[in-house]
Structures are given as structure tokens and as C-alpha cells.
Amino acid sequence: MRLNLHATEKKTTVQNVENPNNSTIPPLQQGSSSSAPQASGGTLASEGKNIASMPAIRQHLSADGENGAARQKNKSFSLKNFLGFKKTTKAPAQPTNPGSNVPESSRIRRPTLGDFLAQPEQDGEIQAPHPSAASPRLTRSPGVSRHSVEDMRDKPVAKADPRETSAIDIKHQLNNFNQMRQNILNKTRPFSQGATTSSVMDARAPLPAIPSTTSEITEEVDATQPEQQLPQRHLDARENPSRILKTGRDVTSIHRFRPTLPAIAENTAEAEANRRIQPLQTPPPLENTPVSPLSLTLDKGKLRLADSNPTAMNTLLEQTLGKEGQHYVAHTASAEGNHHMLLDEQGHLFDLKSHEGGYSVFHNSLPSTVKMQLSKNNDEPIKLVNDNGKLILDRGAEGQEVLHLNPPGEIHHAYLSGIWRHSVAGEMNQENQWVRIHDDKIHYLNNEVGVWQTSDKTPYSQLSVQGDGKLYAVRDSRALHNLSDNHVSESFVDKIKSFAVSEHGEVAVLTDTESPHHICLMPSANAVSSERIAFSLHLADTMQMLQRGEPHLETQSIALKDGRLFAADSEGKLYCGELSQIKDGELPMNPMSQNVLKQHFGHDHRIEGFFTDDNGQVNALVKDNFRQMHACPLADDNQFHAGWNLSDALIINNQLGLNNINPAPHEIVNLGHEGSLTLQDGKVHYFDQLTRGWTEAEAGCQQLKKGLDGGAYILKEGEVKRLNINQSTSSISQGRDNFFALPHVRNKPEPGTALHGLDKTDKAQAIAVVGVNNYLALSEKGDIRSFQIKPGAQQLARPARTLSQEGLNGTLKDIHLDKKQNLYAVTREGEIFRQAREHWQQGESGRGWQKLTMPPGESGIDRIETDAHFHPVAVLLDGSRYQLRGETWHPQNASEPTQLETGLRDSQRVFARLNQDMKGGLIPGTGLTIQASAQLAGKTGRENRQIKSKFAERVRAYIFNPTMATPRPLKNIAYNLQHRWQGRRGLSAVYEMQGALIKQLESQNVRNKGAQTDLQSKLDALDFGEQGATLLKNIKQFREELENSATQAAILLGKHQGVLTSNGQINEKFKPPISKAAIQSFNVNRSGRDLSKGLEQAVRAASPSPQSKLQKLLSHFVTSGLNMSHQKGDIPLGRQRDPNDENALTKSRLILDVVTLGELHEFVDKAALISGHNPDPSQIAQLHQQFEALRENQYEANPVKQFTDMGFTHNAALEANYDAVKAFINAFRKEHHGVNLTTRTVLETQGNASLEKKLKDTLLSLNAGESMSFSRAYSGGLSTAFVPTIKKIPVPIVPGAGITLDRAYNLTFGRTDGGLDVSFARDGGVTGTLSVSTGHDLLPYMTGTQTTAENASDWLSKKHKISPDFRIGATLSSNMQRTLQNSLNFKLTEDELPSFLNGMIQGTLTPVDLMKKGIEHQMKQGSKLVFNIDVSAASDLRAGINITADGSKPDTATFRASTGLSASANLVSARSERSTTVGQLGNTVSASDNRPTFFNSANIGANLTLSAGVAHDFIRGASVSQDGTTKPEKKPGTFPAFMSVNVSAALALDNRTTQSISVEMKHADPVSQNDIDELISTLGKHFKDSMSTTLLSSLKNQENPDPAEQLKSLDRHFSYNNVVGDDRYEAVRSLKQLVQRQRAAESNMMELGSAKHTTQYSNLSRLDENGIFDILHHHFNAALPPTSATRISNMMANNPLLKALIQKLQSSPFTSASVSMELKDGLRDQTEKAILDGKVGREELALLFQDRNNLRIRSINVSQSVSKSEGFNMPTLLLGASNSAGLSMGRNIGTINFKYGQDQDTPRRFTLEGEIAKANPDVASALSELKKEGFEMKS
């Protein structure tokens, strides 16, 4: 296979450079590198692109081109000749394609690595492989698959069925493959070269030695057997390509471009002997492609793939080209089978090619033109005919030509894969060379073994075939290298930005300068500087100059063709100029209006670059508004036409020889369920769980460390970043152009935002990480600094602390932390030092370092590391290992190999076990799940007996605990009354502190009568010298923190009292209520004093700043007459707190802040005594100690501060959440508790110790989107009915009523970024029910009797007859339920989880201790109101016995047995819900007002019931009236009371739909330098104009930058740009959002966080189908905006892949779906600005969600939940009670996240998360098989 050269107008004359030795310089040959079949793929996205920049005029002659330059000087240079205006017009002959006529028989098969490894050795002789069939492979060789070392060692080729596969031991394979390779190489004597070659090689630097393992197999090999040496040489070449060197070549003149190889020939005789080796007969040597051509056909329009194809390729093609619904009308293929073209019904033309580098397939950009012709087909057959490179579409049997198409060429495939082919001069003829760039280095494909090899370490870029058919690349950023002719240009001064070569070999170069319009024109790549022509590009249109304010063109990329220069500017616009018009160093450039591209791709398309195709046509690389790249050829009409889609493609590349790593066990960082990482040569690699191989992820890293929180962190360019494991797929284009999107998520680590605090100028050398909020760094100067970050914010909680150096000796090399956070430092001299956690956290004031004794042994320390449990391990130079336990070192065995494959996680096993316990399924075609349930004699959860606890344990847990203790129901009632009166004993510290703060405020107001200088001014006047600079900075930060905290508390109180609006502005309409003081006077817990006046007095006396917003707010409270009372210092009657104050804790927090500000004033006054007197370190240390006591002990440790930081505003919510936490401590601590019992049953453990371990392992294995919940619920109620006597109605009417009190507790663990999300919740509610029932006995009609009594039988007893009946009945009921909700949510890191679980399960921690665990606490409080109307019907066959005596009145007792069927349905349901979530970072308000919905749920069931009860007849006795009339006895009605036990089973389905709106307001962080750096990087990628690049460069290089000022500069420059294109739009939006955030931070206001409208569906068909009421609503009002279902349905219609994904989600049982909608960008930006202007509050914001024209679909989520619940229902005569506990798990089945651009109605792309994002098993197996064969799918 050879490169197809396009026709040129004139053959290019290449001038040969003189050789000093008068020898012919051969072309550049292949290089070498070590490789293995498990080699990992690198990032190849940038290969083969021409990204342009600007020229350099001044040049320096290179040594290589000196003689050539001298010859060029002697020749005259003519611009006319240079531009191609020759006197002759003779057209050259069209070159033929050298590869097109090569017969298949000439393609000799060559062996692969599998062949060599599969051949057994017997008596020193290698046997040919067995001719039995082998499974299809990516190579043509029939060798065995590379499964494991054992499969390849000492075994013949397996004769089993090739389709059978064995389990793959990846770990063993990776650890031993290099050993096997080295063993083979050790016993193989490679070919040798002659003496001349040896002398050349000896002068070169030797290659690094290949590491060998400790265990080697040595075997003597007879070197005289030629049939053995050739395959061993091939094996040597594939496994150690650095040993390859062809014989018979003169290498003296090309050694600069050849791999450096050691001399391998002992003498000339040996070399001659090696040359006489006969070729291997079986298999024959392969000289061409190592990739098997594909065989495919069409069968009735469906793609059929041959079994002979590689199985992996068949799988991938079946999932893409062969997927369901894809039909084809025509197919054509080359004779060799390496090139196929397919045409489908929609006009998509697919081009599939196999070549030496792999496989590639893509399709045309504009199928509509072809589809138009197909629509005229009239069922006539369609044929594709390839006529000398032209593709003809024929119709009918006679072959009527319908359409001529230009097929893509080899260059299109090369551009996609990054693998290029060119021809070089060989010994006998032209040879094909396959070239690529990897890691900025040129690599060549060794055709004998199919391995990529590198020549040298010189960096290369911009590899491409140019207009003259030659392969070029930019060498070392400043020189142009013609690889085909081996010419290197003289280096330019500036970096080459873009270059172009015409069909005649002329070269235009654009270099990267501040003026991107200078071009350098050369007659050839190796022209000397005197032959270069420099000129500038200027705009020919004067009006365009005026509009731009710049006469020159800001060029980004260029192309040359037919004497014309094409250029794309920074805006992606196209220009063209005639080179003949160059005058005075200027070339006028005219805009090329591209109406055709605009029509096809929209007005916002961009020209990103150019390339020349196989036909010599210039192609523009056009990016459309969906970010897809298209190759568009230039036609005769001077227009670029839609060509080929280069983004929607399938690329499989050969990666053999690239990125082969085999890390040692100690080099692997194990992240548990998230996989494994390693750092090799500054590059982070991850073990890909999909391909089961190591893959590169991030380069340029100094260190990779595992934090104590379980996360991975890197040190890169002086910054610390957490590596977040990817959980979503790459972006998938919305629309139909995503044929080759194979959704799959890989566990690739991606660096997050740099952790705050560390400055790049510190040049950190090593890190030790506690978690994302706490880390230490070792600087280049040897200082160790600790950083404490405020959780959830980009601010330091306190300034960085530099650790004391006392006790340290030597130069520090690395630092580590153990599991107790003790710090270890190792020096370059091999000494180890330790400092305890409590000491290093104090910084310089902490104690010194302790030098540890050296481990035993004579060898020195090599390194310190920590094991999986963070125990320090010292590794000596001799490899021995010692673990530190206490103060002594203990020998440790060598590290065990890390388990690289994660396997089945514990959480997956538990989920599968619970899922097995669920009974039910999906009703076909409905989207509804039907679920079964059963109960037996009051015991619930009996539908499945696979997970069940013992009967005795259930009785003890849910009914009766046989002890002498007070029964639990009685204790609960008593505790509830006690807690309501006096609060919780565990919260007494909070109650006491609230009273103490009142007294402190009063005391401070007595001391401070007059005003004094504000605190900020006092601090500005302090001078502690250099020694006290850090202390002064700490004090200033604390002052700012106090003022901001007090201001936020005052705003919160003002909003609640009504004196401020919801957006924090002054409420001009506020009037103090007249009756408020009178009402508060009746509250004995209130002090009656005005808190506003007391606070205003304290702040006025000790103001925090000159323009204090706090002081202004409090003054406004006073002047507005706000009488804000507070509780007494001492609460009477033992109540401890005021339970009726809804802002008690907020008031206490405000008092705390104000009192602390006053004390800080006093502290600063004392500190001022030594200010300006250069205080000594002891004085500074004393001040620091006093300051720490004030900040840490009095403020941070204050319980009011701690609980208000969690979001609590009053005591009732705090007590409710305290109760929830305590309930679960008791639930897990007591083994007889229902929660403990259910959890142990599900997890299959015995006892609390094993429960703690299994629960820890399960929770740590939770993946993103997974959660585990524990529930505890009980209820009690009263219900009754009355049967009135109504004679005129044939059926009875039975009214009923009931009331139920319920309480539920819930504990949930869910996976979140950086840890686990923990939520404690308590819900309490009351439900009232009204019902009316009726029924009738059908048995008399069936038996022919008149009444039920006539069917009675006395066969059992003469006195107590059995009365059978067959009764049908119906009930109409309504109920209203009100529920109060309380919850506490926080985040736990993985290192905190074990102690958390231990304290909860063993009961060693109090509820307050557990509540203080974790970070980012949030308190939620809300209420829910639900109204339902239900209808039910039942039919029962009953038999009752009246067990009272006949005639007994008024009470009768009855025993009844019955069996029957029942059905119920919800007719109407309405729901309203409100909740507020408050935390230190912000608050969220959610509201759900759902209109009445109909037919929401249904239930059918069967039961067998035994019941007994009593009925009381209300009888009015007979009486005689005054007139003597006798009134008979009258029975108004009957009052029944029954209890029952039954066995029942039911099927239920839910069709509910609910909607809610949530608005989050969060505290704004000031913009940081990290934010600016990321913003500059983003803007720089998309704004290439000179003004923007100059601004961005100047900001990036500023010294001591101010982020706020830099943000203003960026805003001024970019806010006025007319943004076109989605990339620029998103970049500018990021800038605007930062500007809004900074504005909110400066004004101490809250910014808008998330604002969304969410619709929840129980019926998944409602995702894309409207309900009946929506249909009717739109029928009568067509102007209504489309519903979310309509929008999703339209997106599915336009995207078959999205349709398939959603339909797959809808097919999952036990699921619920949610659709989130958000404000469109423009409206959101306006809203954010209005919020900061004080014009819009939360109420006005909620109104925007009522109009769906303002919204866009944000995401679609489908989640699945499985559960196990056990309990007991205990009905009595009138009272009923229930008690239950359960464990449930949820997981994210799939989330589809949509991304938008400038078009806010149609998403541009989407990503997938959850289970649906995982590759299906077939694709996963295919990708894994590709990896084993050395191939990878390119993203």
C-alpha cells in the first residue's frame, strides 16, 4: 500500500544538498524504542494539524545546510519563476498510484509477536505453528492471542475452539511480560553489522538498558540454525526494537536521524554468517500491512461482517455501522479488501480503510444532496462505481449515472489517525514509511514487527503531507523538516505557527510573533536566507480596515495553491491573495465570502486550518456550531464545499511501542474502587478498567501522593491539584452526526482546580495531603508550610503557617503523613524526622522535630513511603523494608502486587442481593413498574423469604423485648414530654452559652460608654515588624471574618422581622407591629429588653470599620422601631431556652460576633503598646498565644458558633436533628433494635464488630450516584366507624374517621466528590382520614334465600350459628397529611468514616460529637401537605360466628374468617411542599405546588383474614308519649370495633408526577489568582487576535498581580466584543460570571447559585409523552410553550442515539425519572445583575419559572431503588400501631446532561453518567482485546 500522489502542473525539481563525503544521503529511516503488546496509547489529538502563526525574517544558517546554501547563492532567483509562471505549459503525465495495482498475492504475510511466542522449542529448534484455525486477530498471523505469560510459555498452539476465551490474569501478565521478553532476548543472538557500522555506533550514546527481572531463564541456542534465528530476530525486533538495524545501508551520513544503537557485531565473519541465513518458510515474512483487511457485504440492506475479521473490529462495526435501523443501498470495495465504501438510505457515504497504522472510518458532511437523488430512485438498484478515483452513483440495471462524488483519500485518514505515509528512496526501489508524532517525537513504524520506533528526542509538531506530496513537520518549533527528502530548513527566530507547501515545492511560513501578518516565502524548505521573501498581509478592503481599526490581517493558518495564498484569521474568516501582487513587502488579501459553507454549517462556522488532499485540492478545516470538524475541498467556483466529517469517526490505531510501562508495586497508588494510578517519568498513568491496561493521563507532574482522605493529588508546576476520577462520557454531539459515538466512561483521572494557598513562586518540591482542605508543601528553600482551606470555598481559613525548623538537619527531600497525621521528613542525607500533629498545626510556635533512629541494616535510606493503611515504611538502598510501629522499626516483606482490576464492589453485591429480594417488574409498553408486597399476621416484608431475619429476633425488635425495663412505648412518651419542656440534656452547653452571651453583651455595654476609633484603623496603625507580620495578618483576617459574620446574621434577622426585603435591601414599607410587645410580655422566657438597641450601642462603641455595613443595619433597626427582644439570661421553670423564638440561635450568633469584636478591640489596644518598638520574638509569641485563645477557644470552639455554622437558626430544629442522630446511635448500638437487625440481615453479619467492618467496606465502595439508606418508622392511630340505621336505602352507608401520628427517621450515605455525603433526617406528621363505605351480601341471591340470616348454619353449635356471606363493598375516602421535616447533611472524608461508624455503632460518641463530624454542614427544615381522594372495592367470602348469647343486647361479639380480593385507586392527589436548607456556604429554598392530578396510583390484592370484635348497638327504648301513643324501640345505629390478623399479598403501581422549584443563594468568594489563571487560559484558546493575546500575555506575566484588577482589565476588553461561536460564547460567559461573583463578594452579598425546575415521574413513559391533560390544555391554547415531554420527544426524533438511550432508561424496573430545567443564559445573567442591584428577590425569581419559554432542559435522570423492610402492624379494637425498619440502596441508572451554546433552545451536545455511561459488555470486551493486541480506539 503506497501513498496516492496527486497530479501537479509541473514536476517539482528538488535540489540536492552537497554531501561532504560525496556520498548519497538516503532518506530518513525508522527509529526505535522499547515496546510491548500492552503498550498504552498516548494523546494524539494534535497530530497532523497545521496550526498557523507568524514568520521570522532574521535567520541563522544551520550547519547541515551550509554547503547547500552556498550553492543556492550562486543561482539567480526569479519571483516569476518562483510563483510558477513558466514558459512551458506542457502538462506532466498523471502519476499512477503505486499501491493501487499491487495484487493481494504479493502482500506476503509476516509473523507477529503471537506467532513467535506460540512456537514451542524442541531440541533447540523452533517449530512452525500448528495449522489449526485460530480466532480472528487484528494481524494476519494465525498465532495465539496474548492472554497471559502462561499461555505463551512452553506450550504449543491451542487447538480449542477459537471462539472460546479464557480468563485473563492481567496482573500476572503485566508483572511478567518484561521478564519473558528479556529471557527470550537473552537467548537470542541478534544480527550484527560490519565494522564500519560498529565504528559509527560506538561513537553514539548507548541506549538505556532494558531492566531485567530477578528470575531469568537461560537457555543455550544453536546460532548455526538459520530457521531459528530469523523468527528470534523478529521477536527481538518487536520486543526490543532498539536492537534493529538493517544491513547493507550506509549509515554514516544519516546517523543524526537514526536511532542510537549499540554495536552488536563481534566481527565481520559473524556478520557475514548472519547475512547468509535462509528466509523462514512458514510463515513467510510480511513486508506490508500488519492489519487484516476487513471483509463485509450487504444482505438486504443490512451489514454483514465476515467471521474471518478480527472479532474486536466486528464488534465495534456492529455497534456503529451495523446497529439496528441502519440500512444501506450500495457498497463497493477494493480488490485487496482494505478499502470499503457504504451508502445508506439517508445519503451518508461511509469510507472505511485498513492500513498499517490501524483502521479508520468516517462519512460525508452533507448527506442531503445524496439523499435527494436517492429519493428519485423508484426502487431501482443503486450502485457505487469507483472510476479512477472518482465515485459514480449509478441507478438501474443499465447503470445510469446519477451523481459524481469525490471520495476521500489517504490524507483524510491520516489527518484523523495522525499516522502518515510517505515514500522514501530505498536500496532497490521506493519504500513506504509510516510516520507519526507521539510525545512530541517522530516515530516510525517498523514494518517487520509492527512496532513504533523513535529516532531521537528532538521535538516535532505539525506533521502533514503538503501540496508537493512530501511529508513535512516542524522541528524544534523553529525549523521545517522535509522528511521525504530529508531536508531541514534554517531555524527561524520565532516559533513556526503555520506553514504551507505548494504543488511546486514553494514554502510559505507564518511565525508566532506579536504581529501575526508577516509571511516568509521560500523556493524550497532548504532555501538559504538570501532566497527568502518577507512580506505582510494587509486587508484589501479599506472599509474593513476602518471597521477593525487594523490594516493588517491577523493570520492563524495559511495554504498555497496555484500561486494563491489562502489565510484564515483569528475570527475564523477566509481571505485570499495572489502572490503575483506582492508589492513593497505587502500582499493585499481579499475576503472570500463562503456562502456555500454558511448555508451548510451556519453563519458561525470557523475556518480552523487547511490541508491538501490526495488530488492536490486545498481543503479548509471547518468547525461547525456543534464543534465538529469538516474537510471541505475548494471547487472551481472559488467556494469551499461540504466534504467529509472528520469528528464523527471511528479510529483504531496501532500503539505498539508507545508508552510501555510496568510500574513496581510501590509505585502504584491504589484508590480502591476508583482504580490505580502511577507516576512514570513525570506522567500520571491510570489502569484503565475498560481496556485493562495502563494509559497516560497527565504529564508534567512532580509528585503523585494519596491523601488521607483517600483521594489522589499531584504536584504540578508548583500547584497542588486533586485528581478527580472521571464519571461521565465525553461529549456526544446532538443531532444525527454521531454514528460512531460509543458511550463509555473510563476511570481517567482529571486534575481539578489548584488548591488554594500555595504560590507558584514557592516552587514546591514535595507535598503531604490530609485532604482537599488541608495539606503541607515543601518549598525549594526547604521550608514546610501548612495550608488550611475554608471548606467549600476558595479561601484560606487562616494564613499559611511555616513550620518550625528546630531539630532538623540536612536538606529535606520529601515529606509524608501517617494515619494519625504525624508528619515525617526525610533528608537527602538519609535521615528521618518526625513531628506530631498537634505540634505542626501550631506552625513556628510548635515544638521541634524528633529525629528517628535508623532502621537496622548497613544500607542507607532510599526513600520513605506509606503502605495502604498509611503506616510509615522505610525502604533501604538494598531494597529491604521496615515499618515503623511506635518508636521502633520492624522488618516488612516486599510489597504485594497491587490488585489492578477492581472487580465486583461490596456495594454492588449488596445491591444485587436487595434487587433479588424485590418482586415486580415493568409493565410492557407503559413505563410503569408493578411491585409486589406481602404480610403475614402483621409481619410486613414477607414477599420474599431470601433475605429474612429469625422470628424470635423480629419479635424482640418490633413487638416485645422480654426484659424488666420499662416498655419502649411508655419510655418514648415520657421522654417526649420531658424533651418538649426542658430540651435535650446533651445540648445544655448551647442553652447555657445563649444565656451567658446575653450577660456578656450587657456587661460590655456597661464598660464601653463612649465611641472609640474603629478596629480597622487601629490595625492599620499597628507595626510589629517582620517578626509579627504573620500575626498582624491573622488579626486583620479575623476582624474581617467577624464583621462579615455579624453582617450576615443581622441581614437574616432583618429579613425575618420584615425590616429588610428578601434580597437584603431596606424595606421602606415596614411598620412595627403594635401588638408585638404586648404579646411578648406573656412569654415568661423573654427578657423584654430591646436587642436592637443593645447591639447598636455595642457596635457604635467598638466599630469594626469606618464604613461598617453592620453599624448601618443596626442603626436602621433602631430608627425603624424594630423591637427585637431576646431570651432572659436565666430561663425560669427549668426550660433552659425559649422554645418559641424562631431566631434564638441567630440572635445569639450576632451577640457572639459583636461581643468578640469588642474583645478584639481590647486585645488590639494592648498590642498597640508594643507597636513600632520592634518587639522581640517572646513578645510576639505572647501576643500570638493571647490571640489564639481569643479566636480558637472563645470564638471557634463556642457551641453557638459551631451550630449556627451548620445552619441552625433556632433551638427546635437543633433538637429535632439531635433526636435523629441519637435515634440512630441507639438503633445501631443495640443489637436487638430493628435497624441493627435488618442491616445485619442484609449484610450477612453477626454482631456489631462484624457489622461495623462490613458496613465500612460497603460504604467506602459506593460509586458516584450510589447511596445507602437506613430507616426507622413507627406510628399509632385511632380509627372508628359508625353504621347508621337507614331504612329507605337498600345498602348500608358507613361513615368513618381516623387520625394517625407517625414518626420516621432516616440515615443516608451517598458518594460525593472527595468523600461521602451523610444525612440524618426526622419526619413527624399527622394524618386525618374521613371515609364512607357501603356493601351488600350477594349470597342470598345465589342461594335463593331472602336474607343473610336464612343462610346461617348450626352444624358447629346450636347456640352459635355460622353465618356465611359473599359481600362486595366499596369505600370512598379522603385524607390530609401534614409532615414536618428536619434533616442535617454534611460531608465525611474517607479517613473520617471508620471513627464515625465506630462511634455510632459502639456508642462511644455522643450525638453532638457525631454532629460535629465532617464539613460543609447544612440544616434543612420544611413541611409537606398532601391531600388524597381514594376509592377502593372488595369482594369477600366470609363466615362469621356470633359468640354472644342469642338476643344479647346491646353488645355482640363476633368472630369471622374471610378470604377475598380487593382493589384501590387514587382518584385525586394534591401536594404542597416547602423547605429551606441553610449552611455556612449559602441557603436553598425549595417549593412544590402541584395542581391536582388524577389516577395517580392503583393497588390490587388478595387476603385471608381472621378477625374478632364487638359491635355496640345504640338502642332507644320504647316509650309512651303524653297523648298515650306508644313509641316503639328504635336503633339509630351500630358502633363496631374489630381487630384482625391476615395473610395478604398485593400488587401496586405508581403514576405520580410532581414538580418543584429550588433556588440557591450562596456566599460569593472573592476572585482568586487560580480563577484568573484558568480564565486567561480559556480566553487565550479562543481569542487569537493580537490585542487579546497581548493583553492576556501581559496579565499572565505580571509580578505581584491583583486578581480583582486583572478581572477588571479582562472585563473591559472582552465585554464589548461581538461574540460569534459557541467556544467564544462560553469563554466570555465564564468571565461575566466571575465579574458578578467578585461584585457580590465586594458588597458582602449573596450570589445566585443553582436555580432549577424539577419534574419527578414515576411513569417513565411520561418523559417523552404528554399526559391527557397536557394534550387537552395545548389543544385549547396552542400558544402555550412546549412541555418538557414535547421538547425531549423532538430531540429524540433528531437524534437516534439519544432516542435509543432514553428508551433504554425507560426499560428499567423500580425506577423514577426527573427532568431538570434551568433559566436560559441571557435571562439568568439579567437576573443575577438585578439581584445584586437589589431589584429582584427570591419571590420574583420564582415567577420566572412559570413561563417555560424562559427555561431549557438541563438534564434527564433515571434512578433505581431497591429495599428490604421488616416490621409489625398491631391492630387493636380502636387503636392501631406499626413499627418497621428498612435498608435501601439507590443508584444512578443514567443521567443525560445537556450543554448549550448561543442557541439556547437546542442543545449542542450531551454527556452521560451512571450505569448507562458504562460501555456495554461487547464493546468493553472489544476494547480490551484491542489493547492486548496493541491497538486502541482514538477518542
Curated annotation (Swiss-Prot):
Swiss-Prot/TrEMBL induction comment: Transcription is positively regulated by the alternative sigma factor HrpL.
Biased composition (Polar residues): 13-25, 94-104
UniProt superkingdom: Bacteria
Pfam families membership: AvrE_T3Es (PF11725)
Intervals of motif WxxxE 1: 694-698
GO cellular component, one term: host cell
Swiss-Prot/TrEMBL keywords: Secreted, Virulence
Coiled coil: none
Primary residence: secreted
Compositional bias per record (Basic and acidic residues), positions renumbered to this chain: 147-163
Observed phenotype of the null mutant: Mutant is not pathogenic but can still elicit an HR in tobacco.
Renumbered ranges of motif WxxxE 2: 840-844
Alphabetized InterPro entries for the sequence: AvrE_T3Es
Residue ranges, compositional bias (Low complexity): 26-42
Record region (Disordered): 1-53, 86-108, 123-163
Motif ERMRS 1: positions: 2-5
Motif (ERMRS 2): 1831-1834
Localisation: Secreted; Host cell
Regulation: At low temperatures, may be protected from degradation by the chaperone WtsF. WtsE-induced cell death in corn is not inhibited by cycloheximide treatment.
Function: Major virulence factor that may function as a water- and solute-permeable channel dedicated to creating osmotic/water potential perturbation and a water- and nutrient-rich apoplast in which bacteria multiply within the infected plant tissues. Essential for pathogenesis in its host plant, sweet corn. Causes water-soaking and cell death in sweet corn leaves. In susceptible hosts, it may act as both a broad host-range cytotoxin that causes water-soaking and a suppressor of defense responses. Also induces cell death in several non-host plants, such as N.benthamiana, tobacco, beet and A.thaliana. Has growth-promoting, defense-suppressing and cell death-inducing activities in non-host plants.
Domain remarks: Contains two WxxxE conserved motifs and two predicted endoplasmic reticulum membrane retention/retrieval signal (ERMRS) motifs. The WxxxE motifs are functionally redundant. The predicted C-terminal ERMRS motif is present in most AvrE family proteins. The WxxxE motifs and the C-terminal ERMRS motif are required for both disease-associated cell death in susceptible plants and HR elicitation in non-host plants.
Entry similarity comment: Belongs to the AvrE family.
Subunit-level organization: In a yeast-two-hybrid screen, interacts with the maize protein phosphatase 2A (PP2A) via direct interaction/association with specific B' regulatory subunits.
Protein name as catalogued: Type III effector WtsE
Lineage of source species: Bacteria, Pseudomonadati, Pseudomonadota, Gammaproteobacteria, Enterobacterales
Primary gene name: wtsE
